[in-house]
């Protein structure tokens, strides 16, 4: 069944930036019809080229060594990747994408700390032709993580717009983002055409990896467990041998606990494993290798880059039992009691974004979800305090 009718998708624009004077701003949604996409491309390209110039002047090396990746749109992630792509017709984009919540741009991971220092100096100053830098949500260099979420005020002729720019720490080779860096945070225009947000592609990948790598013949102990002292994890889930991270790739999640005899410890006939520390996991970033792991084929690889394509791949290569397990995992990731809120100010918008992907999944795979309305309503009742109010 369909819970919601079609809506045009809006996204992002949730960040609050606080500058070093203690003043704050929330990001606005950027109306692409008002700004005009061709103008959007020109203005933001110039902004990043100017920022690159300032960065090189301060640190004696460029933030982006190959500026052609700005002009071509290659350095951008999420929906920004196709909004900024000069090869995609602007009018065609506007049919399916009326607003931009943020601008996602990749930055070499090793340059993030220097970028933060530069931004600190630029507070309240002009950058590009029509922007003033306001601030970001990272109070110091130790809090950077994988993103700097900043606000630049765009002085447009129709009025100021607080634009959220997410600088994403990414892996670069030869001054360009790697294939996996693009894949891990990318967004497909094919998905935008059916008004489905990129997060659904990554969510579905995570679910598929967990289902394909599930191993009911092992049990999982706590990370601190040893062969002499084993404490089992309190979970009802089937253990998963692998996990998927948009930043790191396909990771081997578990390691066996080895006894004094050199063999894997067993309890009740099941081998005992424990979770590896994140830094100790081995990750696979080769996309063709990840594809073969999931589907046991090299065919139709091009479908791997979009949610729409991934649903097609499930239909082509996965049996009904696997698909049902993926459905259960996917719904729980969207609407489990601790699931992430996507639109932090508006439960209705959050529901629209999530149901777009889930309804498409059900329809294309000919699946049903009894009592879907009740299950979704339960989530919003449980998570009602997770939604913020704009001040």
Task: Label each PLM-derived region with a short phrase.
Residues 10-76:
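Helical scaffold of the NTase/Pol beta-like nucleotidyltransferase catalytic core
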Residues 37-53, 93, 97, 106-164:
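Metal-dependent nucleotidyltransferase catalytic core
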Residues 3-10, 391:
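Short linear clamp-binding motif
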Residues 48-116:
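Active-site nucleotide-donor binding segment shared across nucleotidyl transfer reactions
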Residues 144, 150-388:
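Catalytic cores of NTP-dependent nucleotidyl/adenyl transfer enzymes across multiple folds
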Residues 11, 102-104, 166:
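Acidic side chains
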Residues 53, 57-58, 124-129, 207-218:
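Structural alpha-beta junctions
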Residues 31-36, 111, 286, 306-309:
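Helix N-terminus capping/helix-initiation residues
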């Amino acid at each position: 069944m369909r819970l919601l009718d079609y809506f045009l998708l809006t996204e992002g624009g949730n960040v609050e930036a606080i500058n070093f004077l203690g003043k704050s701003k929330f990001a606005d949604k950027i109306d692409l019809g008002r700004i005009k996409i061709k103008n959007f491309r020109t203005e933001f390209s110039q902004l990043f080229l100017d920022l690159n110039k300032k960065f090189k002047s301060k640190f004696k090396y460029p933030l982006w060594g190959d500026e052609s990746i700005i002009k071509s749109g290659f350095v951008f992630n999420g929906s920004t990747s196709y909004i900024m792509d000069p090869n995609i017709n602007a009018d065609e984009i506007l049919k399916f994408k009326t607003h931009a919540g943020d601008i996602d741009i990749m930055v070499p991971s090793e340059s993030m700390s220097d970028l933060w220092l530069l931004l600190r100096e630029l507070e309240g100053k002009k950058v590009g032709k029509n922007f003033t830098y306001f601030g970001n949500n990272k109070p110091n260099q130790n809090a950077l993580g994988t993103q700097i979420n900043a606000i630049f005020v765009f002085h447009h002729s129709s009025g100021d717009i607080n634009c959220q720019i997410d600088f994403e720490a990414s892996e670069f080779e030869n001054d360009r983002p790697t294939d996996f860096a693009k894949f891990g945070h990318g967004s497909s225009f094919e998905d935008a055409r059916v008004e489905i947000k990129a997060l659904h592609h990554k969510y579905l990948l995570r679910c598929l990896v967990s289902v394909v790598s599930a191993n009911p013949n092992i049990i999982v102990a706590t990370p601190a467990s040893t062969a002499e002292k084993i404490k089992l994890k309190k979970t009802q889930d089937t253990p998963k041998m692998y996990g998927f991270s948009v930043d790191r790739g396909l990771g081997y999640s578990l390691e066996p606990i080895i006894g004094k005899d050199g063999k894997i410890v067993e309890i009740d006939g099941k081998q005992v494993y424990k979770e590896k520390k994140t830094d100790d996991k081995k990750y696979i970033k080769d996309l063709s290798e990840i594809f073969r792991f999931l589907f046991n084929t090299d065919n139709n690889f091009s479908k791997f880059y979009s949610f729409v394509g991934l649903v097609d791949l499930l239909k082509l290569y996965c049996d009904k039992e696997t698909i049902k397990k993926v459905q259960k995992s996917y719904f729980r990731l969207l609407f489990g009691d601790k699931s992430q809120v996507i639109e932090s100010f508006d439960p209705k918008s959050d529901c629209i974004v999530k149901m777009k992907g889930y309804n498409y999944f059900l329809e294309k795979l000919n699946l049903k979800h009894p009592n879907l309305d009740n299950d979704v309503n339960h989530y919003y009742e449980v998570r009602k305090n997770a939604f913020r109010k704009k001040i």
